[in-house]
Amino acid sequence: MSHPSPQAKPSNPSNPRVFFDVDIGGERVGRIVLELFADIVPKTAENFRALCTGEKGIGHTTGKPLHFKGCPFHRIIKKFMIQGGDFSNQNGTGGESIYGEKFEDENFHYKHDREGLLSMANAGRNTNGSQFFITTVPTPHLDGKHVVFGQVIKGIGVARILENVEVKGEKPAKLCVIAECGELKEGDDGGIFPKDGSGDSHPDFPEDADIDLKDVDKILLITEDLKNIGNTFFKSQNWEMAIKKYAEVLRYVDSSKAVIETADRAKLQPIALSCVLNIGACKLKMSNWQGAIDSCLEALELDPSNTKALYRRAQGWQGLKEYDQALADLKKAQGIAPEDKAIQAELLKVKQKIKAQKDKEKAVYAKMFA
């Protein structure tokens, strides 16, 4: 008979803790920290722990290192699970346990009754190897068929980012990989706090912070601190780090908005809008024109008459040589702020570009029919 999964994190302080540092498309997203239920399924837990450390050397059946480092999440299904652990073929057809190719189902003590449970992938009864999955919703149809052997205790936000990556079928469009992995020792903080020298003392993901997300005043203090760190990076022209900090602000805002009353959400809008606009400005500096346009659209969803968003989106359109789109945004901005000198100057510049483009086209046609 299966039992409800433990609610405490960790469920047993003596259980081993392991970690994955996850990269998506070559960029570090964050860390997932997992508790392994060695008190309930010791053989299954030991298999996974050793695959995280790589201490067992080369596998007998695969001829590959028994190690998750460099292993992709090869299968992702939204509102279901994220799957990885095929370190040999990297597509779901391979892998190997530390005990040999396969080992038996140890027990089905825990149910798949919530998000963030770690369970063994298999090809039927008693076919456990190295492949695993992390649930992103309750999956009761897997009870009695797959062995639950751990849980996410930190980094569920990283798992959610993985869950929501673009996929082709069930395969991520960008490579989602376990860049680093290992075992955490007693006293380790789990590595969830930024180590980027920025002075950021807040976990990257609000789910890992020991705060009440309903405390809007506390959230405002945290997000203002993070925004200021982002601004410092912006001033030093470190656009990527600035974006990272502004995005962290938005994660805290979104997590708080999800649990607070509607009336309180308005208090968080100004800082959210400011950071979305700043992300757009960073992307313009990086010549990421489409990214800047997308950020400005997000800002306009928060404030449809925001002239900064219209102005910056017009700059993005110009980067793509979509001058008519730029002209439309600037005319709308001018209608809202007719005295704004910067908008007037940009409008003149775009009109000149449109004229130059038309003159060039006329010259081409003239040569064609000469």
UniProtKB/Swiss-Prot annotation:
It is found in: Cytoplasm; Nucleus, Nucleolus; Nucleus, Nucleoplasm. Residues 19-183 form the PPIase cyclophilin-type domain. Widely expressed. Changing residue 285 to A: Impairs interaction with HSP90AB1 and HSPA8. Its EC number is 5.2.1.8. CDD domains: cyclophilin_ABH_like. The keyword Chaperone applies. Keywords: Acetylation, Apoptosis, Chaperone, Cytoplasm, Host-virus interaction, Isomerase, Nucleus, Phosphoprotein, Protein transport, Repeat, Rotamase, TPR repeat, Transport. It is an enzyme of class 5 (isomerase). Pfam families: Pro_isomerase. The modification N6-acetyllysine is found at residue 171. Gene3D superfamilies: Cyclophilin-like (2.40.100.10), Tetratricopeptide repeat domain (1.25.40.10). One of its GO terms (cellular component) is cilium. It catalyses: [protein]-peptidylproline (omega=180) = [protein]-peptidylproline (omega=0). Residues 214-370 are annotated as: Interaction with HSP90AB1. The keyword Plastid does not apply. The modification Phosphoserine is found at residues 5, 198. One of its GO terms (biological process) is positive regulation of apoptotic process. InterPro entries: Cyclophilin-like_dom_sf, Cyclophilin-type_PPIase_CS, Cyclophilin-type_PPIase_dom, TPR-like_helical_dom_sf, TPR_rpt. Disulfide bonds: none annotated. GO terms for molecular function: cyclosporin A binding; heat shock protein binding; Hsp70 protein binding; Hsp90 protein binding; nuclear estrogen receptor binding; peptidyl-prolyl cis-trans isomerase activity; transcription factor binding. Identified in ESR1 or NR3C1/GCR steroid receptor-chaperone complexes. Found in HSP90 chaperone complexes with kinase clients LCK or EIF2AK1. Two monomers associate with one HSP90 homodimer. Interacts with HSP90AA1. Interacts with HSP90AB1; PPID and FKBP4 compete for binding to HSP90AB1 and the interaction is mutually exclusive with the PPID:HSPA8 interaction. Interacts with HSPA8; PPID and STIP1 but not FKBP4 compete for binding to HSPA8 and the interaction is mutually exclusive with the PPID:HSP90AB1 interaction. PPIase that catalyzes the cis-trans isomerization of proline imidic peptide bonds in oligopeptides and may therefore assist protein folding. Proposed to act as a co-chaperone in HSP90 complexes such as in unligated steroid receptors heterocomplexes. Different co-chaperones seem to compete for association with HSP90 thus establishing distinct HSP90-co-chaperone-receptor complexes with the potential to exert tissue-specific receptor activity control. May have a preference for estrogen receptor complexes and is not found in glucocorticoid receptor complexes. (Microbial infection) May be involved in hepatitis C virus (HCV) replication and release. Belongs to the cyclophilin-type PPIase family. PPIase D subfamily. This is Peptidyl-prolyl cis-trans isomerase D.
